[in-house]
């Protein structure tokens, strides 16, 4: 079964949303500064990006520097995400640019999946032995409500999305665990993340856009084959305020000597010497 992301704190039931305090909305410039700090703290390989959903296509097209994918061609969403995070493109995506009534379009709320998907016929004999398993995969996949005309993607450093609905970045497992440590630094909460399997974009931007919660995913075969995601890369998606919280936490961890890259102490060395520095005065 595909589990949904839940963030837990204390004895709160695991299916409750995490408690959030009201904070002023961060503008594009402030988020760009956070992205630069994140890059410095985690030494990311590619640009952190933002995503913003639009009910009005004209409003999306008014985003500064927006470009549209070539007419007459369709791409997977993960391909367009990679164009943004690697080449720095600000892209506007509609149903003209991704396969319509597919997982790509329905995960980001541009339409609903077609019968060939929901029935299980599409993935039967490919990703799943039988139609029932393929249909269950589709039924449990996180998706945004299908009421949007477009999605804009842009590097956070450009400050063109004011402000994005969610922020995303790719990184290796060491970078991801430090980011989570940063989220937990001041106000602890426990995280659980979902694994849909194939169509893992539903666990990252799909889940984050739908719930506005921190979402960590293991990119799937298609994201790696078509989107060019590297073998060691994972994907983090979160609202801007969680990015701010994590950066603050990473700065606090850095002051305690907990930084990226993580310096190996050595598997055959006595750990007491290293721990004595991290936990000085704690005995």
Name each model feature, range by range.
Residues 1-5, 10-35:
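Cys/His-rich short segments
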Residues 28-283:
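Acidic, serine/proline-rich low-complexity intrinsically disordered regions
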């Amino acid at each position: 079964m595909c589990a949904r992301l839940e963030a837990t704190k204390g004895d709160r039931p695991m299916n409750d949303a995490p408690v959030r305090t009201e904070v002023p909305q961060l503008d594009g410039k402030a988020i760009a500064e956070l992205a630069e700090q994140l890059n410095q703290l985690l030494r990311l390989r590619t640009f952190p990006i933002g995503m913003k959903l639009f009910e009005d296509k004209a409003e999306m097209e008014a985003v500064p520097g927006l470009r549209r994918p070539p007419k007459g061609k369709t791409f997977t969403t993960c391909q367009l995400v990679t164009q943004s995070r690697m080449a720095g493109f600000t892209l506007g995506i509609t149903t003209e640019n991704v396969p319509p009534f597919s997982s790509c379009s329905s995960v980001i709320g541009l339409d609903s999946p077609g019968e060939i998907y929901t029935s299980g016929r599409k993935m039967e004999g490919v990703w799943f032995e039988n139609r029932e398993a393929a249909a269950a995969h589709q039924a449990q996949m996180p998706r945004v409500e299908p009421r949007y005309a477009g999605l804009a993607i842009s590097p956070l450093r450009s400050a063109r999305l004011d402000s994005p609905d969610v922020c995303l970045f790719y990184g290796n497992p060491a970078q991801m665990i430090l980011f989570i440590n940063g989220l937990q630094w001041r106000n602890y909460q426990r995280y659980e993340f979902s694994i849909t399997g194939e169509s893992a974009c539903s666990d990252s931007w799909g889940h984050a856009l739908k719930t506005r919660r921190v979402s960590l995913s293991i990119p799937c075969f298609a994201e790696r084959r078509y989107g060019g995601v590297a073998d060691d890369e994972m994907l983090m998606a979160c609202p801007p305020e969680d990015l701010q919280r994590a950066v603050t936490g990473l700065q606090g961890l850095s002051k305690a000597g907990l930084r990226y890259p993580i310096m190996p102490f050595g598997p055959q060395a006595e750990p007491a010497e290293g721990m004595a520095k991290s936990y000085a005065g704690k005995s």
